Amino acid sequence: MPLFNSPFADLDLIRQPEQANDPLLAFDAADQYLLEHLAAQAPAANCKVLVLNDSFGALAASLAGRLEVISSGDSHLARMALEKNLARNGKGFDSVPFMPANETWQGPFDRVLVRVPKTLALLEEQLIRLQGQLAPGAQVIAGAMIKHLPRAAGDLMEKYIGPVQASLAQKKARLLTATVAERPLASSPYPSRYRLDSPALELVNHANVFCREGLDIGTRAFLPHLPRNLGQARVADLGCGNGVLAIASALANPDAHYTLVDESYMAVQSARDNWQAALGERAVEIHAADGLAGQEKQSLEVVLCNPPFHQQQVVGDFLAWRMFQQAREALVVGGALYIVGNRHLGYHSKLARLFRGVEQVAATPKFVVLKARK
């Protein structure tokens, strides 16, 4: 695997989750461009830098020990990658503090390095939170590969931070630099809310939640076919998002015990808010995690899952396949994984490689609901 070279450090970096013979790199030209641009400014050692949305730690790990750096983002996998890459390169795994995106930073910051996220609502929320947290003369520098850099990103920086200057392209990457200027303090439009009729719920959705403005069509196809009569079963909602699957299931199964996990901190916060609103003080475990990687083996009777098919800008079924493997490990013999997926993804054949029985519970023209029994 090639080293990541920058003016601050040469690093051996890995992605998360790790895959054997992974052809994808844990960095790109936008990471290098951001660090080269920062180095050209010759920042003092006490320069306070906030790094946002660092995919696998390339930015923060490079700056560790060179500047005063804090990292923040919405991905638990990104946090794991930062810690592993710091340790992998001879630095303390905790040498760069990490703050989940749903927590408040403590400025003032002299420089903010931003990897532009796929969800612009997350960028908007982060820019609003930066107001009042920037030192005089501070800059917010956002980087992305040009094919993933929407015009709206610069518009948001202009709106909330100050005048924006776009760089020349370099290795198909571009930077947007906003210099702090007088801007009215903004109120965040997040979280957003929407209502369901069946079950009757109002759901809170923080900025980076998938399908934040309404129920996604896969979940809509899944909800009428959630398992019933579960008794005191131990149930996990794997990749829970705003928690709607687990909450709907819990309302129909009052004695079952639930665990909700997601790698997005904002999804976890949304799920906590929604569980509290719908089910009050009913016991539940909700936390950010690498799926069910930390779940005790053979400790669940049921797993519910609407698996993702992309990680940031990378599309594929590798995350779904890993979640299916995790579910199999966590289920008792005779336990069942229930999933919804696009027909064209061929999940039936993939599940058949892991489980002794796979059946179609329901289907629409676009989606299938499957039950896989261990």
Swiss-Prot record:
Belongs to the methyltransferase superfamily. RlmG family. It comes from Pseudomonas entomophila (strain L48). It comes from the Bacteria. One of its GO terms (molecular function) is nucleic acid binding. GO terms for cellular component: cytoplasm. It is an enzyme of class 2 (transferase). The keyword Membrane does not apply. This is Ribosomal RNA large subunit methyltransferase G. Transmembrane segments: none annotated. Specifically methylates the guanine in position 1835 (m2G1835) of 23S rRNA. It is found in: Cytoplasm. The lineage of its organism: Bacteria, Pseudomonadati, Pseudomonadota, Gammaproteobacteria, Pseudomonadales. The keyword Cell membrane does not apply. HAMAP family: 23SrRNA_methyltr_G. Keywords: Cytoplasm, Methyltransferase, rRNA processing, S-adenosyl-L-methionine, Transferase. It catalyses: guanosine(1835) in 23S rRNA + S-adenosyl-L-methionine = N(2)-methylguanosine(1835) in 23S rRNA + S-adenosyl-L-homocysteine + H(+). Its main location: cytoplasm. It holds the Pfam family MTS. Its EC number is 2.1.1.174. InterPro entries: DNA_methylase_N6_adenine_CS, rRNA_m2G-MeTrfase_RlmG, RsmC/RlmG, SAM-dependent_MTases_sf, Small_mtfrase_dom.
